[in-house]
């Protein structure tokens, strides 16, 4: 079996283990409602979560809306309205979908209930902006390109929205909101996942303004005024349950690698750094442990960031892999792969990237300089050229990313 075959097996097994179906059904064992049940599902895993809820509750759900990324829905679900919208930058389709959700949850009684299914990507997909959409798109693009992490990004986005930062739960009053959350943020902070539409907000106006200063963001007077308006700090009508996170993804990958004969070392399930730094670190680990007496697998779960310096095509997981290529060159056998559990990496159709000990030479033979490619943020065409892209298609889940270093036993 090649290292690429091994990587593909681990990826498939990991993704199977973190599908939201069973987790949603377990969480719904705590759910009860005497009146109408309105289901609202947002995020990249919205369709799969809503489908699991429909399988569990069926006709108890009276109406609802499912809002997911383009290409991530899989057909009708009972009486639910299905919407697809833009991600990572919000668009008009997302605004129309959010308005439908607001309409469905307006005028509910105390005995009714909103079943709110939340997954990563919800920040862009579920939006009712307090500034013009064009300005929100510009601010989102600035945040995505400046190197801000997801907590900093969401601290800003909450205050520019009528549904984020706990404001959706306020809108639903007096009806209770029962949230089932698939976490894509390290530490599972409820107020940051999808920008916390049904969670009390722990961030402050001062923190939002500090992000503006740190990255030199260009904001209008209207947007700055929004950043100085505080968000709800208590929501007595809201209850949340986290059902999945990156730790489950790491557990599944570890088990899959062990089944294939590898001894696993989990470096972290809180990875948070520049993508290329993560790749270079994994390559350094490979050189330190080259030619081991037993197969070794080093894994790290979390979410890296990319500071855009070019206008190429790629994503953070592709940059993790590409940045490792030079450090693996010359080793007997070694591979690094990194992928997003949602099946997409940046604005591409790939989930991530794979490199091994021969990838650097293959890139140079093709006339490609990995350092220059990283400067231009153009990992996708380079990895495509050497067969290093990972394709899974939309997975129906979203619990961060996983990077892994494989070192077979010395022969």
Q: What are these model-predicted stretches?
A:
Residues 132-218, 227-230:
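Internal gly/pro-rich beta-alpha loop/helix module
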Residues 322-411:
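Internal helix-turn-beta structural module
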Residues 67-111, 152, 156-157:
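Glycine-rich oxoanion-binding loops at beta->alpha junctions
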Residues 157, 175-178, 200-281, 285:
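Accessory alpha-helical/coil subdomains and C-terminal extensions
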Residues 1-38, 47-57, 88-110, 243-248, ...:
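N-terminal glycine-/serine-/threonine-rich phosphate-binding loop
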